[in-house]
Amino acid sequence: MEQFRGTTILAARRDGQVVIGGDGQVTLGHTVMKGNARKVRRLHNGRVLAGFAGGTADAFTLFERFEGQLEKYRGNLTRAAVEMAKDWRSDRVLRRLEALLIVADREAMLVISGNGDVIDPEDDLVAIGSGGPYAQAAATALMRHSQLSARELVEQALGIAGDICIYTNRNLSIEELGPDSED
């Protein structure tokens, strides 16, 4: 049976603003099944952002599990991510999921994989999914050669990825944590 797949998730931090954005396309084989899926969420009373790349059905399970870890470790993003990665690697059901998560709060930005990896990206930006390399390249150039806000940077880079990657569209969902606001 073919998997639902194809997405692009990009996270960036600039001037105290943290943004995670994702496109809305869900693909089954060679067919676009949905164009407005939300692959980015707010967790832990809006203080943590999370984006998902992988099979759509797996997203709810992973978001729920990660939220449980955030509650257990009182919002400590790094500790919750490490424990989530351990569970993901060792749990028989979770181990079968092929996915990646980007999670971020005001202090940290991490990628969590089913292999048990927790990666702290360089340069305050990271992208995952089929269009991830395109979004990462565009975001890196924009970060180095523009004064765009984190939100504008994510919007522009995801737009570029949507122009290049057939599994990515321009129907974006974006969540952000501002530098001073009570998001």
Swiss-Prot record:
Protein name listed in UniProt: ATP-dependent protease subunit HslV
Active site: T7
Example GO biological process: proteolysis involved in protein catabolic process
Taxonomic path: Bacteria, Pseudomonadati, Pseudomonadota, Gammaproteobacteria, Chromatiales
Known EC number: 3.4.25.2
Family stated for the protein in its record: Belongs to the peptidase T1B family. HslV subfamily.
Provenance organism: Alkalilimnicola ehrlichii (strain ATCC BAA-1101 / DSM 17681 / MLHE-1)
GO CC terms: HslUV protease complex; proteasome core complex
UniProt xrefs under CDD domains: protease_HslV
Keywords linked to the UniProt accession: Allosteric enzyme, Cytoplasm, Hydrolase, Metal-binding, Protease, Sodium, Threonine protease
NCBIfam families reported for this sequence: ATP_dep_HslV, PRK05456.1
Top enzyme class: hydrolase
